[in-house]
């Protein structure tokens, strides 16, 4: 039976989808926890690794002959020594593997994955010195909880607590702030213990103890290491006395947002924005530190990080696939408005007492307000529910383009995006289906591969097709924004996110890159912890872009020929609409 796609039919399904979105955002159930990202054919041999989305940007399969699961630093030393002696390639994997690029991949099929899954212990908590030493496989959630036990707090961190200490150090993970030392987790680290390849005299493995006072050059290299210096075994954090935060969200139009973005971060310590460009709105996060004895027991359990019913996830994904197939821009905009208004009206998951939301401001202790991820907490329920992006169910599947624009250029960049919207106001509704454009403040860091200056980090998430050769609705608009950021404003891509093209020539953007590479050569002269991917992004050998038919559709290249898009489906390589130097895959009706 064939069904006509009438306006009333469209309206019905948009309404139904809106109800599904509402149910998904506010429903919390027991959730099947994510599976181990490493899977082996037999025991710990003949293994593959993937990321939390179930697919790397180029959709390749990363293999290794074995995986090792050390439980102590001594075991880690033994594992690294044996692999070094044998000349085997090694890469580190984590419990949840949330980095999108191929940072966990080793070369060929004969390498070794070293998982930090069981290096997840607290080594020492010193309330008097206000320090906490943990193993590198400790998750952010554990770190926050262990600090709170002794009355201490990590001041800034990512909003998702499923990342590990080693993963945060490897990719430069951060929260949002221009205050203090800034929002990067690695800038609150005082000591790093790392196991690197060693010489025969070292027994083929060497424990290195790094700090700002004793080994400043090596310490600044290790703070954002991409995993190429060795395996971090332990990290010591400098913490602060526990404090509370007072948070409220305010939605405004974006008419003066260009100017507000430059100054808002100076007014509020934990400020950020969610920009809804197609709706012409911005959600301002007014978030400040208050005394620990201030009344309030608030909790932030962010709705999109809660578990979701798999049936609801499948329906929502199917609806967006239909919108893509039918080029239903209006439908996407209606759904986006439903999602954003629902999130705002339900305070994004904030409650004043851990149960209900009664009004702003929400005041709570730092450990209850800074990060969340309750979809990780559940017991096995046979995938009746899961984290929204769990690849074992039909859920969200997306690209994530994330980059830092210097604060001095943010106004101009926002104006460029607004200029694109003037051409077609519906062009960015697809971003608002995925929360909108999250904007976080970052500052310059002494880490050699850390941020270079005060900046705003733009986090853009959008639909990814199951078929890599299927183009997206308004693909050209998002590609142009990506190229405006990277090429016009020389933006720095987030090491743990992004598509391949973002890393083309990236190492030239870091003034301390030569110093980093010098430490790398000293620590691992044979490149045992390096891979084809890390060599490409560090400018050592090769290029991260992949030029082939359809390569621009998945961000593997910037198109220079129609074949790099989808000419059979009407998508051709054309100049940008605002930034003429851009080359984007544009739908050209026949």
Swiss-Prot record:
FAD-binding PCMH-type domain location: 60-242
Q: Which residues form the signal peptide?
A: 1-31
Q: Which UniProt keywords apply?
A: Ascorbate biosynthesis, FAD, Flavoprotein, Oxidoreductase, Signal
Q: According to its UniProt record, which cofactors does this protein need?
A: FAD
Its Enzyme Commission number? 1.1.3.8
- Pathway terms, separated by semicolons: Cofactor biosynthesis; L-ascorbate biosynthesis
Query: What enzyme category does the UniProt record give?
Result: oxidoreductase
InterPro entries documented for this protein: ALO_C (IPR007173), FAD-bd_PCMH (IPR016166), FAD-bd_PCMH-like_sf (IPR036318), FAD-bd_PCMH_sub1 (IPR016167), FAD-bd_PCMH_sub2 (IPR016169), FAD-linked_Oxidoreductases_BP (IPR050432), GULLO2-like_C (IPR055154), GULO_Plant (IPR010030)
Q: Name one Pfam family in it.
A: ALO
* TM region positions: none
What highest taxon heads this organism's lineage? Eukaryota
Single GO MF descriptor: L-gulonolactone oxidase activity
Q: Which GO terms describe its biological process?
A: L-ascorbic acid biosynthetic process
| Signal as UniProt keyword | yes
Q: What does this protein do?
A: Catalyzes the oxidation of L-gulono-1,4-lactone to ascorbic acid. L-gulono-1,4-lactone is oxidized to hydrogen peroxide and L-xylo-hexulonolactone which spontaneously isomerizes to L-ascorbate.
Q: Which family does it belong to?
A: Belongs to the oxygen-dependent FAD-linked oxidoreductase family.
What name goes with this protein?
A: L-gulonolactone oxidase 5
Name the species this protein comes from: Arabidopsis thaliana (Mouse-ear cress)
Q: What is the lineage of its organism?
A: Eukaryota, Viridiplantae, Streptophyta, Embryophyta, Tracheophyta
Q: Which gene encodes it?
A: GULLO5
């Amino acid at each position: 039976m064939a069904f006509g796609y009438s306006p009333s039919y469209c309206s019905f399904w948009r309404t139904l989808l809106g109800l599904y979105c509402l149910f998904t955002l506010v429903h919390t159930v027991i959730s099947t926890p994510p599976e181990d990202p490493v899977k082996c054919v037999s025991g710990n041999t003949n293994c593959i690794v993937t990321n939390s989305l179930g697919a790397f940007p180029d959709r390749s399969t990363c293999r290794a002959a074995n995986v090792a699961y050390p439980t102590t630093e001594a075991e880690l030393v033994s594992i690294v020594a044996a692999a070094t002696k044998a000349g085997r390639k090694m890469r580190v994997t984590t419990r949840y593997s949330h980095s999108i690029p191929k940072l966990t991949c080793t070369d060929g099929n004969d390498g070794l994955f070293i998982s930090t899954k069981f290096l997840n212990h607290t080594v020492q908590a010193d309330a008097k010195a206000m320090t906490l030493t943990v193993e590198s496989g400790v998750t952010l959630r554990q770190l926050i909880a262990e600090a709170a036990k002794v009355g201490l707090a990590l001041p800034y961190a990512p909003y998702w607590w499923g990342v590990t200490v080693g993963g945060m150090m490897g990719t430069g993970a951060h929260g949002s702030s221009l205050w203090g030392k800034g929002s990067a987790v690695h800038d609150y680290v005082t000591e790093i213990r790392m196991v690197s390849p060693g010489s025969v005299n070292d027994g083929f493995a060497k424990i290195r103890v790094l700090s700002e006072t004793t080994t400043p050059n090596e310490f600044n290299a290790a703070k954002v290491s991409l995993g190429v210096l060795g395996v971090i075994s332990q990290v010591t954090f400098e913490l602060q006395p526990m404090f509370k935060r007072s948070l409220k969200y305010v939605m405004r139009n974006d008419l003066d947002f260009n100017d507000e973005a430059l100054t808002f971060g100076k007014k509020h310590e934990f400020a950020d924005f969610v920009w809804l460009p197609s709706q012409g709105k911005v959600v301002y996060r007014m978030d400040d530190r208050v005394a620990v004895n201030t009344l309030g027991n608030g909790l932030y359990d962010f709705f999109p990080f809660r578990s979701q019913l798999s049936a609801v996830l499948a329906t929502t994904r199917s609806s967006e696939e239909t919108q893509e197939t039918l080029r239903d821009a209006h439908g996407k905009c209606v759904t986006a408005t439903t999602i954003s208004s629902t999130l705002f009206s339900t305070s994004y998951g904030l409650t004043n007492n851990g149960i209900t939301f009664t009004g702003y401001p929400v005041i709570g202790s730092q450990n209850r307000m800074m990060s969340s991820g309750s979809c990780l907490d559940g017991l096995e329920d046979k995938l009746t529910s899961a984290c929204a992006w769990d690849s074992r169910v039909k859920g969200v599947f997306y690209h994530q383009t994330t980059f830092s624009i210097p604060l001095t250029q943010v106004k101009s960049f926002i104006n460029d995006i607004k200029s694109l919207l003037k051409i077609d106001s519906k062009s960015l509704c697809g971003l608002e289906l995925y929360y909108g454009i999250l904007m976080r403040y970052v500052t310059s860091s002494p880490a050699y591969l850390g941020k270079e200056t005060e900046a705003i980090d733009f986090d853009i998430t959008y639909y990814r097709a199951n078929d890599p050769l299927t183009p997206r609705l308004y693909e050209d608009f998002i590609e142009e924004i990506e190229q405006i950021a990277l090429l016009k404003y020389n933006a720095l891509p987030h090491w743990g996110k992004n598509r391949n093209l973002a890393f083309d020539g990236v190492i030239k953007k870091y003034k301390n890159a030569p110093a980093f590479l010098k430490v790398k050569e000293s620590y691992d002269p044979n490149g045992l912890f390096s891979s084809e991917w890390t060599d490409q992004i560090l400018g050592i050998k090769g290029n991260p872009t992949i030029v082939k038919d359809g390569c621009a559709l998945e961000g593997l290249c910037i198109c220079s020929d129609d074949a790099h898009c989808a000419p059979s489906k009407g998508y051709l390589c054309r100049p940008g609409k605002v930034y003429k130097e851009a080359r984007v895959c544009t739908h050209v009706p026949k």
